[in-house]
């Protein structure tokens, strides 16, 4: 497969990406290159508008890259339309090894799904077929495993404010926690902390330390409760009933 063109409104990003990939760039729809496959890597809200506005031939293949949006976001005038969803977080300036990113594909029929699957295997070692319902669940799982977790990192940094301790002190802990979760295959099995242990004195001290910040206290109590409830579904059993913590 050959990348023929980067089409982007942002000239700086578009030209930089085109230069990096040794291809052409344009922001003018009249200069849109003829291609076998058009990949719309834009925000969810922009998918339909962009697909309708570009002069893409009806017999061309068109896909978007959104996890939580179905094929129906693409106009029905395209004979071959689908989804090519990479399960990864992307940030400008950070490189990722695309071969290690799971790709999830769906086409509007079996034939095009097979084509997309073959194309995806040129990009990644891990490719799955996933219809809209499965992708919505997958996208939701990714929000919990990525976006929410990163927010908790930020809250951890907030709690350190005023201690003269940098966020760097948390980095080895973050790395080891993530590594254990990945290696275990079931993060429930490697859950640690006062909530899963039923350590009431520590829970009380933490609650007292957060008494000045109702927002963080609410989050702390909610997560502690859920860790406790989740632990009851595994082979690990805390020594204390959660109801006795809040009594």
Labelled PLM ranges:
Residues 2, 13, 17-20, 95-183:
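Internal alpha-helical scaffold of NAD(P)-dependent oxidoreductase catalytic cores
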Residues 5-9:
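Short internal beta-strands
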Residues 177-238:
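Interdomain hinge/lid region at the active-site interface
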Residues 14, 35, 47, 71, ...:
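A general structural signal for well-ordered alpha-helical segments in protein cores
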Residues 75, 166-174, 229-234:
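Membrane-interacting alpha-helical segments
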Residues 11-95:
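Rossmann-like NAD(P)(H) cofactor-binding subdomain of soluble oxidoreductases
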Residues 235-247:
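Acidic, proline/serine/threonine- and glycine-rich low-complexity intrinsically disordered segments
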């Amino acid at each position: 497969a050959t990348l023929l063109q980067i089409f982007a409104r942002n000239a700086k990003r578009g030209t930089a990406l085109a230069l990096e990939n040794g291809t052409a760039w344009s922001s003018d729809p009249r200069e849109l290159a003829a291609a076998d496959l058009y990949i719309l890597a834009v925000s969810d809200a922009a998918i339909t508008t962009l697909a309708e506005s570009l002069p893409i031939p009806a017999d061309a293949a068109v896909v978007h890259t959104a996890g939580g949006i179905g094929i129906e976001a693409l106009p029905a005038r395209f004979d071959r339309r689908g989804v090519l969803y990479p399960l990864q977080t992307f940030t400008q300036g950070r490189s990722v090894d695309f071969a290690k990113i799971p790709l999830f594909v769906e086409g509007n029929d079996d034939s095009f799904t097979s084509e997309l699957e073959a194309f995806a295997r040129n990009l990644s070692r891990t490719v799955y077929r996933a219809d809209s319902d499965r992708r919505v669940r997958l996208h939701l799982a990714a929000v919990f495993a990525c976006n929410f977790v990163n927010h908790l990192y930020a809250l951890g940094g907030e709690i350190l404010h005023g201690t003269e301790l940098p966020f760097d002190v948390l980095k080895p802990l973050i790395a080891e926690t993530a590594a254990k979760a990945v290696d275990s295959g079931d993060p429930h099995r490697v859950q640690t902390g006062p909530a899963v242990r039923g350590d009431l004195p520590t829970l009380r001290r933490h609650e007292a330390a957060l008494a000045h910040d109702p927002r963080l206290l609410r989050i702390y109590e909610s997560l502690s409760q859920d860790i406790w409830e989740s632990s009851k579904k595994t082979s690990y059993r805390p020594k204390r009933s959660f109801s006795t913590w809040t009594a």
